[in-house]
Amino acid sequence: MPLVPLRPVLDATVKYGYAQGAFNVNAVAQAEAVIAVHEMFRSPAILQGADLANAFMGGRVDFANGTLEDKKKGARNIAEAVKKFAEQSPIPVVLHLDHGKNFDSCVAAIEGGYTSVMIDGSSLPFEEN
């Protein structure tokens, strides 16, 4: 099944009254494992990547100093891998950017293949957040 947006998965939780976990993954093997466990329970899987993980997956060893280009490359790399797993899976799989640091990081994730993003404005002044 192709990657799906987050909204339908969350709508189902409201409609049927259940909780849905979301799991941060920092490596392709972790993504594969999360999907495999969700398949066992026949439950949708929400995989989350963060800016730092995207920089790391983009080849940046000192990922805390990752550039936007590192994040773009990493978002593409993780999305391509997760898409392959999702296409072979009978369950819905969401790829979500968790705590995007800024607008550009969110755009990089969307362009890379993420199906959901969250921008973290907690470092901004209250009025801007």
Show which residues each predicted segment covers.
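N-terminal amphipathic alpha-helix/helix-capping segment at the start of soluble metabolic enzymes
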Residues: M1-G21, A79
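Active-site-adjacent beta->alpha loops and helix N-cap segments on the catalytic face
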Residues: L3, A75, K101-C106, S122-N129
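Hydrophobic faces of well-ordered beta-strands that scaffold small-molecule active sites
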Residues: Q20-N24, A45-G49, V93-H99, V117-I119
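N-terminal low-complexity or amphipathic/hydrophobic leaders
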Residues: N26-R60
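Active-site-proximal loop/turn and secondary-structure-junction residues that shape catalytic pockets
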Residues: A27-A29, D51-A53, L97-F103, G121-P125
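Catalytic cores of alpha/beta
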Residues: Q30-A33, K101-G113
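Alpha-helix-loop-beta-strand connector modules within alpha/beta enzyme cores
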Residues: N65-I91, N129
